[in-house]
Design a protein with these regions (language model features):
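Nucleotide-activated chemistry modules centered on ATP-dependent adenylation/adenylyltransferase
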Residues: 1-24, 43-318
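Hydrophobic positions on the alpha1 helix immediately C-terminal to the Walker A/P-loop
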Residues: 39-40
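Short, glycine-rich nucleotide/cofactor-binding loops
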Residues: 27-36
Length: 318
């Protein structure tokens, strides 16, 4: 894997150098308000000197993350495009998926429908504006490895409809709603599509070092705002609750365990925080109160958090 990382690093450096020669915005940077996206924006704007457009999809972003977004945009003085889809669309989507999960549970089911919507919106904006590359703050292991290592394949961006089959076949969503998923066939022949790259797959990744750095750079109001627990999407608390209930474990545990084994995250931190997070979720206390808030927003009852779909029902193409 280290050999692959070094190959990606060489490509990343060449790509950034090529971006400097383009006119207009030289890169679109996905900005969610989490630690990785904040640091990514800083690195590309300050360390590499790119003329970037920050891009945020305003859907289920917590107040803490919005504070960090506004603070970072002000510090770095970059242009910021916010795409705000109808809230009802996401309410409908989340509720449907939680009622009709596939066997890998709620986090997998919802995240891998939710993420392609964000990614597709970024591709749409970059294509419209002639921006050559989209950079996203995915850490190693995100998204699913079979879907992306370092960047999305050209076939995926240029020739593949991203509409999840399980949604398309459900009859619950209109053609207009499904059209929000990326489909390059809607564009005229000869359209130039951007690349979509995850720089943290190429750079040395260290979760604690990134937190230290964005605190030092004053991109967050306080250190706690850099925590992946605090800046998490509110609906994620409900997803984890559903998986603890239906699967008996938190599906983020393998991801963080892999980062710890690779020396990219702190064992000491997650040894304490992982059981604390699960306890907050189970008891709906402190940040775990988001479980109740999100269930009320989605008008869901606990018994409706069901697994009733076959494996891969919503898998995006890869």
């Amino acid at each position: 894997m280290e050999a692959a990382r070094l190959t990606w690093l060489q490509d990343l450096e060449r790509t950034i150098s090529a971006c400097r020669g383009s006119t207009g915005y030289q890169a679109l940077v996905c900005l969610s308000g989490g630690k990785d996206s904040l640091y990514l924006l800083h690195r590309l704007r300050v360390d590499y000197g790119l003329d970037v457009l920050a891009f945020t999809v305003d859907a289920n972003i917590p107040d803490v993350a919005w504070k960090s977004i506004r603070r970072t945009i002000e510090r770095l003085q970059v242009d910021h495009l916010v795409y705000r889809p109808p809230p009802e669309l996401y309410r409908k989507l989340f509720a449907y998926l939680l009622r009709h999960q596939e066997p890998r549970g709620a986090v997998y089911t919802v995240s891998y429908v939710y993420a392609p919507l964000f990614e597709g919106a970024a591709l749409q904006a970059a294509t419209e504006k002639g921006i050559p590359v989209v950079f996203a703050g995915y850490s190693p292991g995100q998204p699913e490895p079979e879907r992306m290592h370092y960047e999305f394949r050209r076939e995926l961006i240029e020739r593949t409809d991203w509409t999840p089959p399980g949604l398309r076949d459900s009859g619950a969503f209109s053609a207009t709603e499904l059209a929000r998923f990326w489909d390059p066939r809607r564009w005229p022949s000869g359209t130039r599509f951007p690349r979509y790259i995850a720089p943290f797959h190429a750079w040395d990744y260290d979760q604690d070092a990134i937190i230290d750095r964005i605190v030092e750079l004053d991109l967050v109001e306080r250190r706690s705002h850099a925590s992946p627990v605090v800046s998490n999407y509110p609906v994620n608390w409900l997803l984890m609750y559903s998986d603890l209930r239906n699967l008996g474990y938190n599906p983020y545990a393998p991801e963080f365990s892999a980062l710890i084994r690779q020396g990219k995250a702190s064992y000491r931190y997650w040894k304490v925080m992982a059981p604390a997070v699960d306890a907050m979720i189970r008891h709906r206390a402190l940040l775990g109160r988001n479980v109740t808030t999100q269930m009320n927003w989605l008008q869901l009852r606990e018994e409706e958090l069901r697994i009733d779909q076959p494996p891969g029902a919503y898998d995006p193409p890869g």
